[in-house]
Amino acid sequence: MHKDGRWAREILQLQKPEGHWGYFHTLSETKKFPVTTEQALRRLEILGYTLEDEPIARAVVYMLDCLEHRREIPDRREKLHDWDVFTDLMLAAWIRRFTGDCPAANRVAERWAGVITKTFATGEYDSAAYIRSYENTFGLKPAGGRLTDFVSFYQISLLIDALDEKTERAMVTYVLNHEAGIYNLYEKILNRLPESFASREANRYLSAVELLAEYRSGRESLHFVADWLEEQQNDRGIAGL
């Protein structure tokens, strides 16, 4: 894979002038929109695209317009979620993948950081504290799987560099031991290595681990993964964490 390769060109050809790729999140109408905006952003990020690249800069401007309600993402409102809270969460998380200098996205991160700080105030996850803090922050009780359980790609990505050391360490420990893994990335416990390295499951596992490794305390907790990668390195030439 290469930044100027075929895969990148195919994705960039699908980008709309406004900066999006069609639906932001919804996996439907694939003939109309072959890729969602977040799928395109994830692939371009993997290929090494940054805010300095015009397609990403244009996408970030679009997402900021949506976050500040000058535009709306075209996805159908999902009734099973707190849609407005969820939309702000998605947009802010993706903006912060590419820049930490967006006040609107950082405000969303600060609100979620407040929720998570109260959730882990005792050093361990407190479900009642999470629900109470969420309701106090957002004005309603959490609804929908991605919000009643905060361990999804969006929250974990959004909160990088947003938590104090004590809260971060407690949260990382909780996520590593979370039986359902990280929603949207790898939905098995992260403290258990995949059975096969050469598998799609291992690829998904490494995506989740790489996200968690972006936390200061994440790398300290992931030595067992680094050891596993080192075992594979001689035969496969895989770089460690």
List the predicted regions and their residue ranges:
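Preference for long, amphipathic alpha-helical scaffolds in soluble/luminal domains
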Residues: 1-241
